[in-house]
């Protein structure tokens, strides 16, 4: 049912909002908070009838009084009436104009300067400052006053001031809604991202697709790299995001931008599944995006397609010709063999997905990439996901905004409009947005600016309140509050056997309240990619006999990702189980106080092995624990047996200095080893 705001109805009835609120409460028992509240149309019609009835009765009474007076002195009164009627008409006309002109002045923020409100009220600065002084407020032209003060000030000049609460954001919510009626939806082309291991031919495959489908009439093909492009097969378009690699894919997903419909997983026929291929598979599964496997380099002598298919089955991907549902297409980027088959499979998969959009609505989509061009200003590549975008439209992009001055397609041609699944490069934004930011078309540039300003304020507030990620210590509380329905884990170990054993044991811990899911498992040190995946999935990283590298530590501290390392699998399982049951009560916290690199090794018969080391970070302390890390894997854990600076014993050695050290019960130190020094710090018990 339609609704009308209180101030709109008051304006229509030519009465103040306060009078209307009083009338609603007394006559109709309708409670309203303020002038921005909305009431049903039925109530509005009743109020109109009531007021029109009162006006008629008052008018009848006035006419009766007028007839009575006229009867007493008809000639004189008729002359006076003519004059007064003219005056009244004139007065009524002025009042009507004033009522229309008064309108509603608005504030978009919590404060407004004296200069701005003076301009809105169309009063001189002196008049406004004088009124403020009478209200006990001393303010200069450039000083700000709050909304309550502005409201009182406006009332002094018979004006009404409103605060635009979340109207623009409400408009955006309407744009965000995808519950389109079926009759308005039309088929759209699929959006594809290419992923896979380094040197498996991702870029070569993209180039092969692009070159084979760009016609000779396009003056050498694509003249401008905009981060995405469209190719055609049998009259149907396919949009490729030219951002090979899973880093961009995950970074965009971490920002909430799900733009990809299908992922092409490139696997070299002569190399098989590699670590980055595993990560790409994990990313696709976590994002719940269908994938097509392109087995590349089939022209190479050592190509073995069946071996690749066999390895894929280990990750739950069974080829169609082996009785599964994973599409595998043998291709060669070098000879162009299988390119058309791959494109046909993409179109077939998109038909099954039934991808649709409504071109006859306000546009929305995602930023693929953006940059600052010296000659053109902020330049952004947008992928339109719904609606139609036109030159001249005003858009909000993340916390920036703008009016589209020019728009180019993937061939570098100037275009006036673009529909769903189309990549375009635009000019006209106030600032450079970030990849993954969503954009929405709004009614005008003023609205766009207002929304962008509010978003900047929100970002500032959110920055002050750090994002609360999942950690083992507060997992039980979050489960009880219902904020965690699924616990995502990234498992890294020194050998594959440990990864598999742990995955199986952890997934058995799932309960009705929370499901435990291992998003990714791999061998080797914990790296920045693992942290990025954990950030995107709001997961926890578990390491066994492995340590995080420096980049991973920095990223985890920045993003608030919890990294737990263990020596025994049983300890990890017990920790997760205890956290889920609310029994985890940590008593000690391990604090790494410094690291040193072994530069030289000396063997002394009576003493053992002495390492000459350089302290890279923090400090080394004599009574602290010590780990020997080789190629990112912990090979021994003990404590420092001795620590010397030149020939003297030292309690500690600071960063930037060299020292001599030995590890308790360990002599197999080698050059290049990293010695990690740590202490166990007692912390207060947490009640979960």
Curated annotation (Swiss-Prot):
The biased composition feature labelled Low complexity covers 72-82
List the Gene Ontology MF annotations in alphabetical order. GTP binding; GTPase activity; translation initiation factor activity
Q: Which InterPro entries match?
A: EF-G-like_DII, IF2_II, IF2_N, P-loop_NTPase, Small_GTP-bd, T_Tr_GTP-bd_dom, TF_IF2_bacterial-like, TIF_IF2
Keywords carried by this UniProt record: Cytoplasm, GTP-binding, Initiation factor, Nucleotide-binding, Protein biosynthesis
What ranges does the record give for the region G3, renumbered to this chain? 242-245
Q: Which SUPFAM superfamilies match?
A: Initiation factor IF2/eIF5b, domain 3 (SSF52156), P-loop containing nucleoside triphosphate hydrolases (SSF52540), Translation proteins (SSF50447)
Q: Where in the cell is it found?
A: Cytoplasm
Task: Give the protein's biological function.
Answer: One of the essential components for the initiation of protein synthesis. Protects formylmethionyl-tRNA from spontaneous hydrolysis and promotes its binding to the 30S ribosomal subunits. Also involved in the hydrolysis of GTP during the formation of the 70S ribosomal complex.
The similarity comment for this entry is: Belongs to the TRAFAC class translation factor GTPase superfamily. Classic translation factor GTPase family. IF-2 subfamily.
The protein in question is named Translation initiation factor IF-2
Q: Which organism is it from?
A: Clostridium botulinum (strain 657 / Type Ba4)
